[in-house]
């Protein structure tokens, strides 16, 4: 071993001790999770929920766009129809063990029924418990868009009421009045 190799080795040791000394008194990045809350960015994508419109009905019209947009195929649903012609999902199932929380299902949904919330505490001991049914996904409120009602915007009539007479429904727009 030459003197040059000895000095290089000593220099690397001094540099390592110096770096450790600098980082020893720096603020720690590790958070003690259950005791300290975790900072979540404003657009954090967590648990998927199904929302309701302002009238209290479920927003999902079972158009199947969310299942088609899902890159891993973790969403499955079956369409059914009420007496007044509205579509709804007979069953709606999401397998969270396969979901990558990409948000493509939320973007594809025309009724804003499917939304990603900042909830991330979904740990289970069995994989079968990560398959959520419609009853597990439905929340009581409208979610991020409290005033949006798909059927009011679409103009579909409700059985027994004329267009524009339903609760939270706007009067129909006369398209001829919009012409220049």
UniProtKB/Swiss-Prot annotation:
Keyword Iron-sulfur found: yes
SUPFAM superfamilies named in the record: 4Fe-4S ferredoxins
Topology of this chain in the membrane: Peripheral membrane protein
Protein name: NADH-quinone oxidoreductase subunit I
Recorded catalytic activity of this chain's protein: a quinone + NADH + 5 H(+)(in) = a quinol + NAD(+) + 4 H(+)(out)
NCBIfam families in UniProt: NuoI, PRK05888.1-1
Record-linked Pfam families: Fer4_7
Gene3D superfamilies documented for this protein: 3.30.70.3270
Biological role: NDH-1 shuttles electrons from NADH, via FMN and iron-sulfur (Fe-S) centers, to quinones in the respiratory chain. The immediate electron acceptor for the enzyme in this species is believed to be ubiquinone. Couples the redox reaction to proton translocation (for every two electrons transferred, four hydrogen ions are translocated across the cytoplasmic membrane), and thus conserves the redox energy in a proton gradient.
Organism from which the protein derives: Escherichia coli (strain K12)
Bound cofactor: record note: Binds 2 [4Fe-4S] clusters per subunit.
Major subcellular location class: membrane
């Amino acid at each position: 071993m030459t003197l040059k190799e000895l000095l290089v080795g000593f220099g690397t040791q001094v540099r390592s001790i110096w770096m450790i000394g600098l980082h020893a008194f720096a603020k720690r990045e590790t958070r003690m999770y259950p005791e300290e809350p975790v900072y979540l960015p404003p657009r954090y994508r967590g648990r998927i929920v199904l929302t309701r419109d302002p009238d209290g009905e479920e927003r999902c019209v079972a158009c199947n766009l969310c299942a088609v947009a899902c890159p891993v195929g973790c969403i499955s649903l079956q369409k059914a129809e009420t007496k007044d012609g509205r579509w709804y999902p007979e069953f709606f199932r999401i397998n969270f063990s396969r979901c990558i929380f990409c948000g493509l299902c939320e973007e594809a949904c025309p009724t804003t029924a499917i939304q990603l919330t900042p909830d991330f505490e979904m740990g289970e001991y069995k994989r079968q418990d990560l398959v959520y049914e419609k009853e597990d996904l439905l929340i009581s409120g409208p979610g991020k868009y409290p005033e949006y009602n798909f059927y009011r915007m679409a103009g579909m009539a409700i059985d027994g009421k004329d267009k524009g007479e339903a609760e939270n429904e706007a009067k129909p727009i006369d398209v001829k009045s919009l012409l220049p």
